[in-house]
């Protein structure tokens, strides 16, 4: 049994690259980490073929919070958070994965500060903190939006 981490975003857009950064820097037993760029739907077949019990999606999300704050975003609140770089809305992707695979999907948003010149210090600190939370499996440390 394993879990899958999907890092979503675009590094060319500053803080929008935090999901990709987390995916590239996360390694832990029982996890498969995938850098999805801005197209997590391209990995639907891989997720379906896996024995994953949990899928965690990490992305920059405009939630109206201070830069670097992170939240678990329930599926009924996805519309309240802004995700600007995806071709398919994350809500549709998540619903499809849950219905076809029957896995638990957790969406973690990190509030961006800026969308230019690399990942900002506050957002990078949040990404590093999230790596540790993922390794511990202690999702309860993250507030729900």
What do the predicted segments below correspond to?
Residues 1-112, 117-145:
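N-terminal catalytic or cofactor-binding beta/alpha core of small enzyme domains
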